[in-house]
Swiss-Prot record:
The gene is rplR. It comes from Streptococcus gordonii (strain Challis / ATCC 35105 / BCRC 15272 / CH1 / DL1 / V288). Belongs to the universal ribosomal protein uL18 family. It holds the Pfam family Ribosomal_L18p. PANTHER family: 39S RIBOSOMAL PROTEIN L18, MITOCHONDRIAL (PTHR12899), LARGE RIBOSOMAL SUBUNIT PROTEIN UL18M (PTHR12899:SF3). One of its GO terms (cellular component) is cytosolic large ribosomal subunit. The lineage of its organism: Bacteria, Bacillati, Bacillota, Bacilli, Lactobacillales. This is Large ribosomal subunit protein uL18. Coiled coil: none annotated. SUPFAM superfamilies: Translational machinery components. This is one of the proteins that bind and probably mediate the attachment of the 5S RNA into the large ribosomal subunit, where it forms part of the central protuberance. GO terms for biological process: translation.
Amino acid sequence: MITKPDKNKVRQKRHRRVRGKLSGTADRPRLNVFRSNTGIYAQVIDDVAGVTLASASTLDKEVSKGTKTEQAVVVGKLVAERAVAKGISEVVFDRGGYLYHGRVKALADAARENGLKF
């Protein structure tokens, strides 16, 4: 009997493979994206110190209305503004094993437009 692969397990495997190749430093931290069915979360992480430097998600009060893609744009804008306020201008983009399409792409484009370089 053929079993259908679990999409999330395949994504996690892809994410582990990519994470082995990229890491965030204090000079160039990692912009991590997590996408759930209902929301999207973004963190700017310094992997050397193991510290989250800035974050934004659909749980924030500023992000409440609109479609999921519109919310992703607002989250990208917020995380970029918070990172730039802390003096971070360059990051390494970690798409979390997700395809660079839809909400993930919308978040990345909004972060670029608001001052983050990657």
